[in-house]
């Protein structure tokens, strides 16, 4: 009996030990350390989720075994969506930090909106005469004294300085080639309105003319492009009234631009942000036009972060208090905040890596610190988003009806003198202390902030995706019979006209930017499936070019399954049309440029503007009931694996950049 008791005791001890250690052995690596927030009762900062390590396929294995059939209950897709709408809802992807953009089903509340601060300044001022990049001047922000203590031809006081290099180079605001890309990115992100920064009473009419015409062009093609709001500043009253009159004349009075008005409260009343004294002057004016302004416009009030008064119906473009305050449903989310007014003050300002650590008991305001190691994750911006995401849906409808993001493309600030020797900038400084969402080539920033913005817009403003039915259909791949393709709900659109030739001057200096890599301008992608194959019908704006021997960048189809694991190349498991022979293409399982293995053949047929590709499900590890993939189509993108930012700047990519389309969710 004693022996039996001893055995049972040992077994019980063994089971207790296994219970303790098993969570530690459930994955091959421990989660990444998050910032220390032990001083807080709760941690309001959302860190990028970390991927658990997965088992790498054994040597010589071309494809993991087909997973067991998932149990997914699907429903008919009765939504009446255009291809453009379907595309925006089915954006997907995963960034280097493991953050995920998931497809969505539609807006939770059609009366909530996301706005973006949009700037028009580059190349428009007399001090925009050269290219001065603070990140390069300070050797990737490692020697700040090179900027703050010197006034030389390398970094002259009084000149506008870039905080870093934009993905399209140091571009001029009138470069329509760049502007087309911007409109595409903002539309695909789900941004509802642009707020034009004219707060210094400069209207940049040569820039806005290009912007408005391009917005109208894409709107006429069926894209739900962002609408437009002007943001006017407070200076001399008479001068401010004159600026208001001019804005009315060049934009709001023109019938051609009426479809670009942002009208959230009344379809006949465009929103405009104006100083409180200008609005009051119109209400009291005896001037006929000014009296009409009072009833014509939906006014919001210009709100500066340093003002003592929070205006009724205010529209803050930044908030120095955390959590941010709502002003009659308008709340600002900024990537960084220059709370000491001097963004060069890297101790006092809140950079991209700032996160809240402790809440003051009396005011409820949070204090925090800058994480100089993890600023590329935009911890600050995520904390700003969390202010909204932590609200209930009812609170969001009341306090976050207008989520206003600062900002998209500011890029420059004037170098100013502080005393005899010190120099500074006000609004933006270096990559860590900058507030642009537009992708950058500086200091490893890439497009992380843009990616995170889409993720949060999806989480905030949209309902989770639904498992819809994708009825089986088998097209004849030997001809372009559009009949069967028309039965598919899964038709995705790409912007066209945005991959033409580029030839425009930089913001300053003698540099001229040129690009002629645009070749096949991708228009639509329609996907079908049956019990054995996936089918893709890709159309371009013009006839698809013939494949040339040795061209690995011709009409590539990149694929990632829902069960992707192990090493991926640029985030993708498979590529089609990397190796083409006649009407056949190898389906390459790709781990790196030096490790590509064929897992089968795809059929590829071209019919003028259309290409039809047939891929065996089995080659991708998929099956009749398990066919979820993310995909991207690219043409002539240069060196995309080593430099994925080239997906924004060379050839054509559908969808743009590091985004994918989702099929079969």
Predicted region positions:
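Ser/Thr/Pro-rich, low-complexity mucin-like regions
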Residues: 607-653
């Amino acid at each position: 009996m004693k022996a039996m008791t001893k055995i049972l005791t040992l077994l019980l001890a063994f089971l207790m030990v296994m219970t303790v250690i098993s969570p530690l052995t459930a994955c091959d690596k421990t989660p990444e350390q998050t910032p220390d927030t032990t001083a807080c009762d709760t941690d309001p900062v959302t860190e990028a989720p970390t991927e658990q390590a997965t088992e790498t396929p054994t040597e010589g294995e071309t494809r993991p075994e087909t997973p067991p059939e998932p149990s997914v209950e699907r429903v008919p897709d009765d939504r009446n969506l255009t291809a453009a709408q379907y595309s925006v809802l089915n954006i997907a992807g995963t960034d280097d930090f493991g953050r995920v953009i998931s497809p969505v089903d539609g807006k939770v509340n059609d009366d909530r909106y996301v706005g973006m601060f949009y700037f028009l300044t580059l190349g428009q001022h007399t001090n925009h005469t050269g290219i001065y990049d603070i990140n390069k001047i300070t050797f990737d922000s490692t020697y700040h004294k090179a900027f703050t203590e010197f006034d030389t031809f390398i970094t002259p006081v009084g000149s506008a300085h870039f905080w870093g290099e934009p993905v399209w180079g140091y571009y001029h605001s009138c470069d329509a080639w760049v502007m087309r890309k911007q409109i595409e990115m903002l539309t695909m992100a789900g941004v509802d309105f642009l707020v034009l920064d004219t707060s210094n009473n400069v209207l940049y009419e040569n820039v806005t003319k290009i912007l408005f015409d391009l917005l109208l062009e894409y709107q006429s093609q069926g894209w739900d492009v962002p609408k437009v709001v002007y943001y006017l500043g407070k200076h001399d009253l008479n001068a401010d009234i004159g600026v208001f009159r001019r804005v009315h004349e060049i934009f709001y009075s023109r019938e051609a631009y009426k479809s670009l008005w942002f009208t959230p409260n009344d379809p006949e009343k465009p929103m405009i942000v104006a100083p409180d004294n200008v609005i009051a002057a119109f209400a009291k004016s005896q001037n006929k036009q000014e009296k009409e302004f009072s009833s014509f416009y939906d006014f919001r009030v210009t709100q500066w972060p340093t003002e003592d008064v929070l205006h009724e119906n205010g529209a803050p473009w930044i908030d120095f208090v955390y959590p941010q305050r709502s002003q009659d449903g308008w709340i600002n989310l900024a990537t960084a905040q220059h709370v000491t007014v001097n963004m060069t003050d890297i101790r006092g300002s809140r950079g991209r890596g700032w996160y809240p650590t402790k809440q003051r008991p009396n005011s409820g305001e949070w204090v925090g610190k800058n994480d100089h190691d993890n600023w590329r994750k935009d911890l600050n911006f995520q904390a700003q988003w969390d202010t909204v995401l932590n609200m209930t849906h009812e609170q969001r409808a009341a306090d976050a009806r207008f989520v206003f993001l600062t900002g998209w493309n500011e890029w420059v600030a004037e170098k100013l003198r502080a005393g005899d020797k010190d120099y500074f900038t006000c609004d933006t400084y270096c990559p860590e202390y900058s507030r642009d969402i537009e992708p950058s080539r500086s200091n490893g920033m890439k497009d992380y902030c843009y990616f995170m913005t889409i993720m949060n817009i999806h989480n905030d403003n949209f309902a989770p995706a639904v498992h819809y039915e994708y009825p089986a259909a088998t097209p004849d791949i030997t001809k372009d019979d559009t009949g069967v393709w028309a039965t598919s709900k899964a038709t995705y659109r790409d912007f066209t006209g945005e991959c033409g030739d580029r030839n425009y001057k930089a913001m300053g200096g003698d540099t001229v930017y040129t690009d002629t890599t645009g070749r096949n301008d991708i228009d639509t992608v329609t996907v079908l499936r049956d019990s054995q194959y996936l089918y893709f019908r890709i159309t371009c704006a013009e006839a698809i070019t013939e494949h040339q021997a040795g061209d690995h960048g011709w009409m590539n189809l990149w694929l990632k399954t829902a069960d992707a694991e192990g090493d991926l190349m640029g985030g993708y498991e498979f590529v089609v049309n990397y190796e083409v022979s006649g009407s056949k293409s190898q389906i390459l399982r790709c781990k790196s440029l030096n490790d590509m293995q064929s897992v089968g053949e795809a059929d590829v047929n071209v019919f003028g503007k259309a290409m039809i590709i047939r891929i065996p499900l089995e080659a991708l590890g998929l099956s009749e009931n398990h066919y979820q993939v993310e995909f991207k189509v690219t043409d002539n993108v240069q060196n995309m694996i080593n430099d994925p930012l080239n997906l924004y700047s060379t050839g054509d990519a559908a969808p743009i950049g590091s985004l994918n389309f989702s099929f079969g969710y």
